[in-house]
Amino acid sequence: MTAILEKLTLYLAYPFVRYALIVGVLIALCSSLLGVTLVLKRFSFIGDGLSHVAFGAMAIAAVLQITNEMPLVMVITVISAVLLLRTGQNTKIKGDAAIAMISVGALAIGYLLMNIFSTSSNLSGDVCSTLFGSTSILTLSPVEVWLCVGMSVLVVAVFILFYNKIFAVTFDENFARATGTKAGLYNLLIAIVVAVIIVLAMNLVGSLLISALVIFPALSAMRIFKSFRSVTVCAAALSVACSLIGILASILAGTPVGSTIVAVQIGAFGLSWLAGTVLGVARK
């Protein structure tokens, strides 16, 4: 135990480890806040669809040889979020079909572009890193950390400022419209915020694992608590704790950061399931 603590203390002295912890906590917090809303609206796989769009956008940036791909990926993902929302409201193309269509299309086009216009000698490594997250936390630069901090503050501020409206749109959209709430506007706001979170999380967990940050904390919290506020707070706390444990475990074990975080979240979901079952029996 002493050896482990000494090893952690040694690693925490390095800036790149602190960067990973900061980014991991902020991304976990933001994704869990929106995750509860997306799960309750049965739109949780929008994160999966947009993450594949972000992969395609990164492929375009690689083809154009853009060194700082973040702005381009952000713009394309936000535009896709808006289009996805509009397409999902189409009576001929339902929400789940729209997500599947955009998700698979973006993933295929992205991989095709990376093969045709490959500028790297290690294409398989680049694709694996993009899909499953960087195997090394050394890739997080100070610029990315500050960008993540700024965007995370914006996301949390939006959620707090419009909490009541988001709550109304989440539970009964028709009633919210009847009371004068512009449900379409707040749905659009949610989609844009999710797009921002997706782009920020890609370097940490990769495009294929982002949905886990959205889904698992919300489902875990719902097993224990019933009210929207309690579920949201619990999901945020669980997500932050799992990210911290996952990052620290990946440092000690030398495993990929994203996969380790998701594995910890799966374990937390299992414990929450057991706790919910025990509480359910006790209440009876």
Model-predicted regions and their roles:
Residues M1-L29:
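Membrane-interfacial amphipathic/re-entrant helices at transmembrane-helix boundaries
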Residues T255-K284:
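Cytosolic-side transmembrane-helix boundaries in multi-pass membrane proteins
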Residues N203-S259:
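Transmembrane alpha-helical segments in multi-pass inner-membrane proteins
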Residues V23-S31, A57, A61, L72-L84, ...:
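Alpha-helical transmembrane segments in multi-pass membrane proteins
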Residues V36-S121, A221-V233, S250-G254, T277-V278:
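Short loop segments and helix-boundary regions at transmembrane helix junctions
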Residues L21-V25, M70-V75, A97-M101, V145-G150, ...:
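Hydrophobic alpha-helical transmembrane segments
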Residues K7-L10, S103-I160:
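Transmembrane helix-bundle core of multi-pass membrane transporters
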